[in-house]
């Protein structure tokens, strides 16, 4: 079982003994327990285990008790804190001073004791000391004996906790570059300063010859390989598509069979490189058994590898999927072309939702007029104002087929613990594996092809690094859409019929970048996007503020934005205030 960070709950109290403190002990501790129960009951880690909370041993009224709480949290592996109170407390004495923890304060809205006054006072202290904290204050007054958590308070607590757990989970992990820069793509020029200072992560790197060495020297689990090949024969190879290569570039059946064996070994080895494998230690490969402690990775592929060896499409697709030959499991995060910037956006989406993430080229904007000209048909329904073609070189998660269903029977991408064996088979059945286009991939291989079901709410994200500014984040909430099959066929075949397609329509609003579908495409900051199931823009914005990454483009309603209270001091324009606050505070780990 993986070890995850915990969330610390800090019940603070008026320190005046002799009647005041004693009258508040039970109430304050009950609020702390209610917050812990809320989080544990609603939030899960990537493997499906509940997010754990640690409550201070007692209420915190004076600085010695703050220090004792801090020591306990360090021992217990806490990665973020929520301070809870129903009364006045001594602000600077009782506040959380750990500079690395995301922190929030819930001040109970009651009349008998001034929880709101403490909230305001301690948030002022956090702002003055440069330790931003999220303020949580219920809209409606509660009675003193009411220990329930109002819906608006619960929403903010869970939004904070979800993002804070993501921050703490990635801290101390690695991003593994398998290979180096792919085709001059800026996102694959990996910036170690960004990872270290903003995410608290380290960068690991291997030359792709390491994969060949492990194949040649048998540094992989042979039993697992046999199991993996049998599974691949049953579920993937049987869905091998037509070979569209010209005759002189078409591989023989024997060569294709060798490619299947090669890419299955490659998948096992890439996974072992990321997380290690205790089986390798049993086989005598102690160093290789360790792995690189990678929570995310990227595979360069093009051009040096793919010009000579089978491409990484199968390996990337399977690793990014919530299942493989070992059964249903948490999806990995692996960026095509080692685009680390997109890999980070995928990591954000995965940690916030516990779902597999789609990696795609943001390939083409199709206007209604262009579609009519090319196909003779009109886009209708949600696609009527134009569509964005999200497509990748056969390396997209199979969860993206939309063959999983939610409680309402609608297409979905689900956390691994909700996925059924029947849904696994549907995802596999909906995927065709085409021999790779050898104009692009001279070494061959196989590319996944599917068409995502329409009607899924999704959020497209992208992290960009800007010289002189630093990282910025883009967010576009929208939906996958289904279009007329004849329109899809014509548009798909003039793009690449061997690759997976997701037709995307963003939610439009009065912001310039979202005035129409074309503007979303025109304002996108790079060639790739990370697509997560669900409208999670609010959570992404909260996470970005914790990491001091400004959001330059989003279509989230302003009243849904939840950032640290200190952001209010940087002006009433939320976008400008975000930039000013992130610049002022700078990265957490610098």
Curated annotation (Swiss-Prot):
Reaction(s) catalysed (UniProt annotation): L-fucose = L-fuculose
Pfam families named in the record: Fucose_iso_C, Fucose_iso_N1, Fucose_iso_N2
GO MF annotation list: arabinose isomerase activity; L-fucose isomerase activity; manganese ion binding
Alphabetical keyword list: Carbohydrate metabolism, Cytoplasm, Fucose metabolism, Isomerase, Manganese, Metal-binding
GO cellular component: cytoplasm
Origin: domain of life: Bacteria
Cofactor: Mn(2+)
Coiled coil: none
Location of the active site: 337, 361
Keyword Metal-binding belongs to the record: yes
Pathway given in the UniProt record: Carbohydrate degradation; L-fucose degradation; L-lactaldehyde and glycerone phosphate from L-fucose: step 1/3
Residues annotated as binding Mn(2+): 337, 361, 528
Disulfide bonds: none
One biological process term in Gene Ontology: D-arabinose catabolic process
Enzyme class: isomerase
InterPro entries, per the entry: Fuc/Ara_isomerase_C (IPR004216), Fuc_iso_dom3_sf (IPR038393), Fuc_isomerase_C (IPR015888), Fucose_iso_dom1_sf (IPR038391), Fucose_iso_N1 (IPR012888), Fucose_isomerase (IPR005763), Fucose_isomerase_dom2_sf (IPR038392), Fucose_isomerase_N/cen_sf (IPR009015)
Protein EC: 5.3.1.25
Subcellular localization: Cytoplasm
The protein's role, per its UniProt record: Converts the aldose L-fucose into the corresponding ketose L-fuculose.
Sequence similarity: Belongs to the L-fucose isomerase family.
The protein's name: L-fucose isomerase
Source species of the chain: Bacteroides fragilis (strain YCH46)
Gene (name only): fucI
């Amino acid at each position: 079982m993986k070890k995850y960070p915990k969330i610390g709950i800090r019940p603070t109290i008026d320190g005046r003994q002799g009647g005041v403190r004693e009258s508040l002990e039970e109430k304050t501790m009950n609020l702390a327990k209610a917050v812990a129960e809320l989080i544990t009951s609603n939030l899960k880690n990537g493997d499906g285990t509940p997010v754990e909370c640690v409550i201070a041993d007692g209420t915190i009224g004076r600085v010695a008790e703050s220090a004792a709480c801090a020591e306990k949290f360090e021992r217990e592996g806490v990665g973020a804190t929520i301070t809870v109170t129903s009364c006045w407390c001594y602000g600077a004495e009782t506040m959380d001073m750990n500079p690395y923890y995301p922190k929030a304060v819930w001040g109970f809205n009651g009349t008998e004791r001034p929880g709101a006054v403490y909230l305001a006072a301690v948030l002022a202290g956090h702002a003055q000391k440069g330790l931003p904290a999220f303020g949580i204050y219920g809209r409606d007054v509660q009675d003193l004996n009411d220990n329930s958590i109002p819906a608006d308070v619960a929403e903010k607590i869970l939004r904070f906790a979800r993002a804070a757990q993501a921050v703490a989970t990635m801290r101390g992990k690695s991003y593994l570059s398998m290979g180096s820069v792919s085709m001059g793509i800026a996102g694959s020029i990996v910036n170690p300063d960004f990872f270290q200072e903003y995410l608290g992560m380290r960068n690991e790197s291997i030359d792709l010859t390491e994969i060949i060495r492990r194949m040649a020297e048998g540094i992989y689990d042979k039993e697992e390989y046999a199991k993996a090949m049998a599974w691949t024969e049953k579920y993937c190879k049987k869905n091998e598509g037509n070979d569209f290569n010209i005759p002189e570039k078409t591989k023989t059946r024997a060569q294709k069979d060798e490619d299947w064996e090669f890419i299955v070994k490659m998948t096992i080895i890439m996974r072992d490189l990321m997380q290690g494998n205790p089986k390798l230690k049993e086989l005598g490969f102690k160093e290789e058994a360790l792995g690189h402690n990678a929570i995310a990775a990227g595979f360069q592929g093009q051009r040096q590898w793919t010009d000579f060896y089978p491409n990484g499409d199968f390996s990337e697709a399977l690793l990014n999927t919530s299942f493989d030959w070992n059964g249903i499991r948490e999806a990995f995060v692996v960026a095509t072309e080692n685009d680390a910037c997109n890999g980070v956006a995928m990591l954000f989406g995965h940690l916030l939702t516990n779902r597999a993430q789609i990696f795609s080229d943001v390939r083409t904007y199709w206007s209604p007029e262009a579609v009519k000209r090319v196909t003779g048909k009109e886009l209708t329904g949600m696609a009527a104002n134009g569509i964005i073609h999200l497509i990748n070189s056969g390396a997209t998660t199979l969860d993206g087929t939309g063959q999983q269903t939610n409680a309402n029977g609608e297409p979905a991408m689900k956390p691994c613990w909700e996925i059924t064996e029947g849904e696994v088979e549907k995802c596999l059945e909906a995927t065709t594996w085409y021999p790779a286009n050898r104009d692009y991939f001279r070494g061959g291989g196989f590319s996944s092809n599917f068409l995502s079901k329409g009607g899924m709410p999704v959020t497209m994200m992208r992290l960009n690094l800007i010289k002189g500014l630093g990282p910025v984040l883009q967010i576009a909430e929208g939906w996958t859409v289904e279009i007329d099959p004849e329109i899809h066929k014509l548009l798909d075949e003039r793009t690449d019929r061997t690759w997976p397609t997701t037709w995307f329509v963003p939610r439009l609003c009065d912001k310039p970048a979202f005035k129409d579908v074309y503007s979303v495409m025109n304002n996108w900051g790079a060639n790739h996007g990370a697509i997560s199931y669900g409208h999670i823009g609010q959570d992404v914005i909260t996470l970005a503020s914790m990491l001091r990454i400004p959001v330059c483009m989003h279509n989230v309603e302003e009243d849904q934005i939840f950032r640290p209270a200190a952001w209010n001091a940087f002006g009433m324009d939320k976008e400008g205030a975000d930039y000013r606050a992130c610049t002022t505070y700078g990265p957490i780990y610098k």
